[in-house]
Regions:
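Active-site anion-handling motifs in enzyme catalytic cores
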Residues: 7, 11-14, 18-21, 30, ...
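Short, charge-enriched, intrinsically disordered boundary segments that mark the beginning
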Residues: 1-6
Length: 441
């Protein structure tokens, strides 16, 4: 398979198919834009941003990217019209977005895409694990010639694969990034690697993942679950398990082929990756009055939480541990996190949503997750970042998690310092975006 085909296959595996248009449609849209440019020059309409985001719904973190960026646009660019071009907003996500952002137009067909290409002034690629919608950014650039930017991505050479991307595929991505008005990377190693690979966009800097700004809530669902399981506000911690590679092949609707190499790596590390979490749970229960909620960030983690954590705990500890058996959406999850004393585990975006609200959160990571976890160092939380492949880091996990329960006030203060730093960076990025938007005439 050609290197570019390999890269595109990986993108499609992650994001799925999105609304697209034919070459004839592109030609028609380009012609319409040319004809409408004269009228645009004399108009006084709102400027229009096309947000390319919403990659998948099997992970509440991937859901959170979009409402986070939409909230920033709502706050800092209230006079700008926003259209969302999603890959997947099923499983109730569309309803969440429409209820929270009723003024945002959601693109659902190739005709909508063609209209957006014609009528929008700026394309903003949302946060993600890489330049997920690279082909759509290329389409925008080639068919419209209008400006675009990238908001909070990781840049790596593997896209969550066990093998590196071909140099040709990386070069193609760099070419797209170089055409952007700005590229914001969500972790500093991504910025450094992009520069090393030849990326030289006019503005390149760190910016927090869009999910930090998410404000979705579902208080009724969260309160009902917590009441049912006697979990009282600020008297419990959340814990999230995770395989090194998400086993998408276990989710029927994804129809992802079994990946033997990824599964082998998962099974090789799964015990070592969860033993520190188990011990932390034991110490929390036996040394403090707090309980622990085992909860998921994606649809593969409920079973993992039971088999690797709950079922292997001593009976006296199990009595104060609640296992959530079903998946949830971002609003209910975030409402739950807001009522907790903090969160720890092997995931990234639930901690992001916590820190975005000033809730303490500890991140355990490994190389297979790319460099995204290093954002914790970028925002001043290096003491809450642990590399599971470094024995010295592993030794510090349990005592550090325990401090969330023994010194909740100190932990909250630390989280809020990081939150304020993130918010300042968000303001800077929105000012940059505002400065790059074309005048509306």
């Amino acid at each position: 398979m050609h290197p570019e085909q390999i890269a595109m296959q990986r993108i499609q595996e992650f994001a799925g198919e999105s609304p697209s248009i034919s070459r004839r449609g592109l030609f028609g849209a380009g012609l319409a834009m040319a004809l409408s440019s004269l009228a645009f020059a004399n108009s006084d309409r709102k400027r229009r941003i096309l947000l390319r985001s919403s990659w998948q719904t099997v992970n509440i973190g991937d859901i959170a990217h979009t409402p986070g960026v939409l909230r920033l646009l709502e706050k800092y660019l209230p006079d700008v019209e926003v259209r969302l071009w999603p890959s997947n907003i099923g499983n109730g996500v569309e309803q969440l977005l429409r209820e929270r952002f009723p003024s945002v137009t959601i693109i659902k067909s190739s005709r909508d895409v063609a209209s957006a290409l014609e009528e929008c002034d700026f394309l903003l690629h949302g946060s993600g694990p890489f330049l997920v919608a690279q082909t759509d950014v290329e389409r925008w650039a080639k068919s419209t010639g209008k400006p675009y930017g990238v908001y909070g991505i990781t840049f790596s050479d593997n896209h969550y694969s066990t093998k590196p991307l071909p140099p040709e595929a990386i070069a193609r991505t760099v070419e797209v990034l170089n055409g952007a008005k700005f590229v914001f990377f969500r972790d500093s190693p991504s910025l450094a690697l992009a520069k090393e690979k030849g990326c030289h966009a006019p503005i390149m800097q760190f910016a927090p993942d869009g999910a930090f700004a998410t404000d979705l809530t579902d208080d009724p669902r969260a309160d009902a679950f917590l009441a049912k399981h006697d979990l009282r506000a600020k008297q419990f911690l959340c814990c999230i398990p995770r395989y090194r590679y998400t086993p998408y092949w276990t989710i029927p609707e994804r129809k992802t082929p079994f990946d033997a190499s990824k599964n082998e790596i998962n099974q090789q590390h799964v015990e070592a990756d969860h033993a520190p979490l188990r011990q932390a749970i034991i110490e929390i229960v036996r040394q403090t009055e707090m309980k622990v909620l085992l909860c998921p960030e994606d649809q593969t983690q409920m079973a993992l939480g039971k088999s690797l954590l709950l079922d292997r705990l001593p009976q006296d500890v199990q009595a104060k541990v609640v296992w959530r058996p079903d998946y949830w959406l971002t609003g209910e999850a975030r409402s739950t996190y807001l009522r907790s004393a903090g969160l720890f585990g092997n995931e990234m975006h639930s901690p992001i949503m916590c820190i975005g609200a000033g809730i303490p959160a500890i991140v355990c990571r490994w190389q297979e997750q790319t460099s995204k976890g290093m954002m914790w160092k970028d925002i001043g939380l290096e003491d809450w970042l642990f590399d599971m492949d470094e024995p010295r880091d592993v030794e510090r996990i349990v005592p550090t998690v325990l401090t969330l329960a023994t010194d909740p006030q100190g932990a909250a203060e630390k989280a809020n310092v990081a939150r304020k730093f993130v918010e300042k960076q968000q303001e800077v990025t929105m000012k940059i975006l505002a400065g790059e938007l074309p005048d509306s005439g």
